[in-house]
């Protein structure tokens, strides 16, 4: 059994019902929209974000559940899907999860409007049911995701990202949505504010570890879904590179920056950069940082009694840092 399927076992029934509710939440009177959303549902991913909502809700309430939890999971998945559709337009990407992206099939104009539609459906699902606490959590995430993306674009132009700014970017771009999932899971079953914020922090730590793992893939010798060196080719300043720039000599620093700025499409130079980062401790340092965040997430779970839901969250943490793709 695949790790994600193993993690899903305690909430298998909830996830199956969620899929039906999620489909219903996207329905429209416009036939074109229904064709597109049907296409989106058919090419679903691992659905890790709804899994976080359900597992946290069950863990903090001793297996309890609420209709609000389904709505919270649907809101999260609607917002997440909207951001993916918009991301593909921004990145001019023609593929998503092995399928053609929405913009590849229906062009950018329709893709942007579909993303807007999904975003509005998510917000209205909360408003119509007066789930204002859940709406606030997801709205904070949407704001931070936009800020993180723009901060990265601003800093990428000069390649002057410090480690502090790097962590702020990945916290906003990646971790904030997982934090919202965990916070929404707790809030949906009536957990107190302290627990909601603790679960948000738990999700944030996992999200940061998740993104750091993604950064490490760029330097991996193993064959994975993501091509080696793609971040360097796209001039993305990731933690292994940032740490190496902070610890090497001025001469080496100039060579590194010049390589990323002007020779990022030269395969030989990209390989040289990867080798230099590896030889100068960039991978070891980054792996240590990833494990630091993993341990912070584990420390939060220690506050909760043993349960199948807690076990799945522990497995989720391991999966995030040990996954091959």
Which residues does each predicted region cover?
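All-alpha prenyltransferase/terpene-synthase fold signal
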Residues: 1-325
